[in-house]
Amino acid sequence: GSGLVGSEMCIRDSCKTGAFGVNVSVCEDCGCISVHYNSCRDRCCPMCQEFPKEKWVDARREDILDAPYFHVVFTVPEELNPIIYSNQKFLYSALYHAASDTLSELAADCKYLGTDIGYICILHTWGSTMNFHPHIHAIVLGGGLDVKNHWKDNGKDFFLPIKVISKTFRGKYMAELKQLWENDRLEFHGSAAPYKNYYTFKELLNTCYAKEWIPYCKKPFDGAESVIRYLGKYTHRIAISNYRIKDMTESTVTFSAKDYKNQGLWKEITISGEEFIRRFLMHVPPKRFVRIRHYGLLSCRNKSKKMTHCRNLLGCKKYISALKNRSATETVSYTHLRA
């Protein structure tokens, strides 16, 4: 509602202005005084993501193995966008359920790998132009533990056929969507309003079932360090970063975006300030919604024992966090020195 929109924009507009307090430093030698304005710490603020990203990525180093990793992207047909946007908490969660069930169940099938694997799922809801484009990025460990607790992988080849992933993911997501509709758990606002009618909703299901859902699997990462760099790039990303904003006037904003209809070349787009804010706010996640989730060997209940066992089987050294127990000031100093 308008209250949420106002509060979200007000918070970010006040970041590092003094509205959230200040820290004052005084030099013991010369008495020079420095004033540092506090940040808003909002997870959608472009100025506040670097610090939590560095701490999170550094902690993830303890979970990384010297083993193959793959990047799989799960997308849904654009026809579902209106109903997903009207039911973000339920239907974003359904994306995680469908993606995780697909990966875990197929990996456990002896026809493919026959193991318990580990992976991280990250929700992004935007395209390059800040359009609404919900999709899941999954960083998938390319091996796992079989029923005898032995390590098994498929080398540098991804162990699951893309067509099988596609059909399985489509079936699981559509089944949960249908169940939510039948249980009267969905809301129908704006362009989703027609789907409150059973026959219109049924037509939507038929259209989406008839489409090929094309998950995307990238080449394997080149070692554990490249996985870490990739996690840093994707995990705490927001709809648009400051460097992409090229110009602003009293009424317009110009920003750069990739043109995927023209070989992914960058182009500049100018839209009204109101439209820019509208697009940005589409990607504010529901309150307390967890965007980064861990599964299988990497889940909280498993990783302490099972990842240690995997590390021993593979002969991997355990990375010790460089930032654990450091203060915010020490963390900032460390990351700046490393850069």
Predicted segments with their positions:
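Polyanion/phosphate-binding surface patch
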Residues: S25, D29-G31, P134
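Residues immediately within or flanking Cys/His clusters that coordinate Zn2+
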Residues: V22-V24, D42, S333-Y334
